[in-house]
């Protein structure tokens, strides 16, 4: 094929991609997000994330609470769950009994014990990177970059958890102060989800102004809808599995991790769709991998 013919093919390819982008922007946002979720097999991805959350993040949160409480016999990591979900008696007693007291975890606070859970965080971050790459229609990074970027993302996520917990669970506040603290805790979450595509997506740093808008998806879903839903449905899950004792608490946690996993996949899809609709067409076309949906 001559150079002129190749140039014509490139031009036709670009025109087709611009046409597909224009057509995609005409679809209702909710329908576009649903289509993207199905396109990347979001249900399966969410289930995988839920298992990794249950086996990695929850143990690290428990060990971290125990460490900062001085492994006290009168402290229970279940307190975090109780305060986060606003549980009341008799559910509070069940949760405390299921988690035990902090002194029981003293032997877990070793380099090998903590490092084991941290290492498991790397596969989780690589999974999240794959989800975002698919949702944003980008080619994934090579293995070395995926490991480095995934580790950075995972450490940033743990930092955000600590900061948010410090803000919202730092004291027994009520009324306007509690509302202000809740709003303040949304800021690091917004920053985190705005930076996630930059870390995990190829060419993810393009259109930074529009990434800030995409980051709002994380604020709405991860920091608002999921916590509110947790306070409504988690107590019902615990009550429904009352006869199973500690296993019932574990099953409720696993179920909730499943919803969080789905929420994260939806966050990736919503952020991608928002970015594609608000960023300049040239930026979107230059950044995306040439993938024909379906």
What residues fall within each predicted segment?
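Membrane-embedded alpha-helices and immediately adjacent juxtamembrane helical segments
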Residues: 1-294
